[in-house]
């Protein structure tokens, strides 16, 4: 049966998309990474061996998949080549298995320098920093919107590319030197580094919309992989504490050129609790010892930055907002095992503002910053769920928690992850893996 599936994070990222896509792609031959850059970190664990992917689709470890990067992704050529080399060192062939949109914007040294300079400047002026990953992602997307981005296809004509590069570097150096008082970047050095990578990039770059539509006509199935999470969307997230791309369904459609009518299922990934990296509102944040228990057991450290993630209870208000925008067909609930030793587990069912107003939905930063959670408390199950592969074998209180979440968000939970390994999983909707 043909099934085109979109897989999206439905919180602030780090929900476990990598594992789920790796699992689902065993039966699907095409996986498309749709937005973001090497600020994302998707982790796949196979027999206790961890692989962290920043640019390549999370299906790359499945040897039968074709792994595609669409034009919504900003590409650091140096980091992409490093990642390809890392995969090959694991003994996994990538020959004829990676394709990149010729329209992907490049992330280059001056983007990184600008990103770092801005964050440093915000701290100096005592302005709240965004908490970026310092990977140059924001400036790269700015270039795309300003119509000055260098893209993969520009590498074909080296003379034209060098001229464009020189002009852009002059633009960035003016700001770095005169406003931020930082060191300039050298366009010759950037050019020479890129030329060494250009042959590989040109060999695997194609027109992605035409390719994907040809797959559709052959009745083949495709997974579309989102990065980050819907609450970090540039339009609908906790702006300005968001990423620089559209992390929602609309971003998938626009970055791939695929028809929305060809999508058969939209799978949201949610943790059994909440986390976020960096600054920004986080109404259910935990500050007592429970935070440290979840942090350590859940290994909640950023796969890209290594920073400790902020920990919070499950926020049903935020998730219901994301459901509005993405029309999820079902959810995968991850990291249920991390809560195995927690005596009391809380679910945020609504917010209250200082004026006493109760909110069941929220859309702007002013309300986010003032909102306090109203909780529904449930008893923890205090027994092992890790590695359980059948729903009936879960502790009764764990089942109750899952059923309560489902009754609040009113979308079926159809997959449950019970550990970090690709096989620690319960599939309730068997059609997703047929």
UniProtKB/Swiss-Prot annotation:
InterPro entries: Adenylosuccin_syn_GTP-bd, Adenylosuccin_syn_Lys_AS, Adenylosuccinate_synth_dom1, Adenylosuccinate_synth_dom2, Adenylosuccinate_synth_dom3, Adenylosuccinate_synthetase, P-loop_NTPase. GO terms for biological process: 'de novo' AMP biosynthetic process; IMP metabolic process. Its main location: cytoplasm. It is found in: Cytoplasm. Substrate binds at residues 303-309. Keywords: Cytoplasm, GTP-binding, Ligase, Magnesium, Metal-binding, Nucleotide-binding, Purine biosynthesis. Pathway: Purine metabolism; AMP biosynthesis via de novo pathway; AMP from IMP: step 1/2. Mg(2+) binds at residues 14, 41. Its EC number is 6.3.4.4. It is an enzyme of class 6 (ligase). The keyword Nucleus does not apply. Its cofactor is Mg(2+). It comes from the Bacteria. It catalyses: IMP + L-aspartate + GTP = N(6)-(1,2-dicarboxyethyl)-AMP + GDP + phosphate + 2 H(+). Homodimer. Plays an important role in the de novo pathway of purine nucleotide biosynthesis. Catalyzes the first committed step in the biosynthesis of AMP from IMP. This is Adenylosuccinate synthetase.
